[in-house]
Amino acid sequence: MNNLTLSLHRERRLLVLLGLVCLALLAGALYLQYVKNEDPCPLCIIQRYFFVLIAVFAFIGAGMASGAGIAVIEALIVLSAAAGVGTAARHLYVQLNPGFSCGFDALQPVVDSLPPAHWLPGVFKVAGLCETVYPPIFGILLPGWALIAFALIVVPVAASLLRHRGRLR
């Protein structure tokens, strides 16, 4: 095996790991929803969509054989995670500024009208308000943890893209 083959093999394994981590984060959100009775708000659901999108892209990328294909998938992962950073930051802002609303009435119908909300309402249906603050985990609010997770996805995947930018040729 040459270095490029080894690099692609390692990259694909890391993409599988990333997909599994995103699914584990979604499982954690469902645990909080159903066991701890912490209802998801519109911004929570949007963050779930981004974690699912990242997982889907990661699993697709793990099945690709070409470096250029993996690079395109990694770019989609970076875009999804960056959008997740923005959503989580907005959610954190809403929770840290009492009296400020996420626009529950405006966002809920939009989020609830998306097809996955009809296919899997237990996962993607809005049931709470964005300004509801649930007990922090290790001193960090839930949107803060989502922000950290999305940032920890953006940075290494973007670094991988930059490190392997020759694959696009």
Curated annotation (Swiss-Prot):
Topology class, membrane: Multi-pass membrane protein
The keyword Chaperone appears for this protein: yes
Transmembrane segments: 15-31, 50-64, 72-89, 145-163
InterPro entries with a match to the protein in the record: DiS_bond_form_DsbB/BdbC, Disulphide_bond_form_DsbB, DsbB, DsbB-like_sf
Membrane-side (Periplasmic) residue stretches: 32-49, 90-144
Record-level GO BP terms: protein folding
Disulfide-bond pairs as recorded: 41-44, 102-130
UniProt subcellular location: Cell inner membrane
Gene Ontology CC annotations of this record: plasma membrane
ATP-binding listed as a keyword: no
GO function term, MF aspect, one: electron transfer activity
Alphabetical keyword list: Cell inner membrane, Cell membrane, Chaperone, Disulfide bond, Electron transport, Membrane, Oxidoreductase, Redox-active center, Transmembrane, Transmembrane helix, Transport
Cytoplasmic-facing ranges: 1-14, 65-71, 164-169
Signal peptide: none
Family affiliation: Belongs to the DsbB family.
Summary of the function given for this chain in its UniProt record: Required for disulfide bond formation in some periplasmic proteins. Acts by oxidizing the DsbA protein.
Protein name: Disulfide bond formation protein B
Species this chain originates from: Burkholderia thailandensis (strain ATCC 700388 / DSM 13276 / CCUG 48851 / CIP 106301 / E264)
